[in-house]
Amino acid sequence: MAGNKPLGKKLRLAKALKQNRRVPMFAIARTKGSVKQHPKMRHWRRNTLKK
C-alpha cells in the first residue's frame, strides 16, 4: 500500500488496528478461561476492511 494515504483511510486503518487486539489476561482469568477470544478478531490477510 502506498505511503501517501487519504486521511479517512488512514483513520479507518488505525481504528481497525486498535480494535484488533486480543482479550486481556485479566478477563480470561476472571472468567476462568471461558472467554479466550472475541468474535471480531480480524486477520490481515484473510479478511478485508471496507474501503
UniProtKB/Swiss-Prot annotation:
Coiled coil: none annotated. Pfam families: Ribosomal_L39. The keyword Ribosomal protein applies. InterPro entries: Ribosomal_eL39, Ribosomal_eL39_CS, Ribosomal_eL39_dom_sf. It comes from the Archaea. One of its GO terms (cellular component) is ribosome. GO terms for biological process: translation. Residues 32-51 are annotated as: Disordered. Keywords: Ribonucleoprotein, Ribosomal protein. GO terms for molecular function: structural constituent of ribosome. The keyword Ribonucleoprotein applies. Residues 33-51 have a biased composition (Basic residues). Belongs to the eukaryotic ribosomal protein eL39 family. This is Large ribosomal subunit protein eL39. The gene is rpl39e.
